[in-house]
């Protein structure tokens, strides 16, 4: 089994250091959010094409990449555990585009983007868990949220296991309770 760690937007693989200290190292996928989803996705496909038995551990936007990768490379993927992943898109991005019109990231992650529209249509073919973070609140969102994405967006896919944790969007990668949940799910693939 190959654990593949994919970080969230504007982060690095170091965001998984605590989780990796408990689960073990794997393949770190690093990307630059400014490059655009499609360019990063192609680079990730190339990096993973010679691997097999992949289990993704991904945070936020990293989970969207994992979903698209699993859909495009189903024979080499075993499943995934994602953290705080907004499978319905990040609603705040649709508004932020007006203030940041040149941001590729904002164009990629809004619910109306092609990336998210396609993510909503993907039928999950592998065991998949999203750890839904329910603590935190951003005043820029009218729905309950974890400080970055809405809880409803994290629950968007009904064809995966959803596990709620009392963490915000950033604390999730540092939580002992989350590490235990991730470890339990990853061990099922061993």
Positions of the model-derived regions?
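Serine-dependent carboxylesterase/thioesterase catalytic core
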Residues: 3-7, 14, 23-127, 138-139, ...
């Amino acid at each position: 089994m190959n654990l593949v760690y994919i970080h969230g937007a504007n982060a690095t693989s170091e965001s998984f250091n605590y989780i990796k200290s408990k689960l073990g190292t794997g393949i770190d996928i690093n990307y630059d959010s400014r490059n655009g989803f499609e360019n990063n996705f192609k680079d990730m496909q190339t990096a993973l094409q010679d691997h097999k038995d992949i289990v993704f551990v991904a945070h936020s936007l990293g989970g969207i990449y994992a979903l698209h990768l699993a859909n495009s490379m189903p024979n080499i993927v075993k499943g995934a555990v994602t953290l705080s992943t907004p499978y319905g898109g990040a609603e705040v991005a649709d508004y932020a585009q007006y203030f940041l019109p040149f941001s590729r990231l904002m164009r990629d992650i809004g619910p109306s983007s092609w990336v998210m529209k396609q993510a909503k249509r993907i039928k999950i073919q592998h065991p998949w868990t999203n750890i839904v973070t329910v603590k935190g609140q951003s005043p820029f969102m009218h729905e309950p949220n974890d400080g970055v994405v809405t809880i409803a967006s994290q629950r968007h896919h009904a064809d995966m296991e959803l596990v709620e944790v009392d963490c915000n969007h950033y604390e999730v990668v540092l939580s002992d309770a989350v590490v235990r949940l991730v470890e339990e799910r990853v061990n099922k693939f061993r």
